[in-house]
């Protein structure tokens, strides 16, 4: 069986991804002989140019769990439309479980004002100026997924103009 070699282009695509571990938790499964321990890792993967994903991995060791989390995160990537000032186009909110996240665009120079898992998701998405607030649950996985949900609902100016049947220039006049 012949092995397929990675081309230089595929290697370049792999090198610009960044990953950050949000949480590592030791979990247990009760089996006949007692408790079987394993690790769960929540990982955010992004390239800081508008692509980001959240993954969860479970394995018997921490490194294996993180590796699986990165692979899962790359499977669940979303595209984030960024403005010229590296912010988002409009206010939006996202929900996942009991967690609700509200994100608002901010002026250049504001920075990322957000906490916990939401901050990590926004930074790896490439957003530089944004305000975000977590409401409800403080569960890191649900907050990260709520942030992804909020970023998924973003629309660009051209998409809104196309929906309304007008040109982008006439959108706000």
From Swiss-Prot:
GO molecular function, one term: rRNA binding
InterPro entries reported for this sequence: Ribosomal_Su5_D2-typ_SF, Ribosomal_uS5, Ribosomal_uS5_bac-type, Ribosomal_uS5_C, Ribosomal_uS5_N, Ribosomal_uS5_N_CS, Ribsml_uS5_D2-typ_fold_subgr
Biological processes, Gene Ontology terms: translation
Cross-referenced PROSITE patterns: RIBOSOMAL_S5 (PS00585), S5_DSRBD (PS50881)
Glycoprotein in keyword set: no
Classification via Pfam families: Ribosomal_S5, Ribosomal_S5_C
Keywords from the UniProt entry: Ribonucleoprotein, Ribosomal protein, RNA-binding, rRNA-binding
Gene Ontology CC terms: ribosome; small ribosomal subunit
Function statement: With S4 and S12 plays an important role in translational accuracy.
Domain comment as written in the entry: The N-terminal domain interacts with the head of the 30S subunit; the C-terminal domain interacts with the body and contacts protein S4. The interaction surface between S4 and S5 is involved in control of translational fidelity.
NCBIfam families associated with the record: rpsE_bact (TIGR01021)
Family: Belongs to the universal ribosomal protein uS5 family.
HAMAP family from the UniProt entry: Ribosomal_uS5_B (MF_01307_B)
Subunit field text: Part of the 30S ribosomal subunit. Contacts proteins S4 and S8.
Designated name of the protein: Small ribosomal subunit protein uS5
UniProt organism field: Synechocystis sp. (strain ATCC 27184 / PCC 6803 / Kazusa)
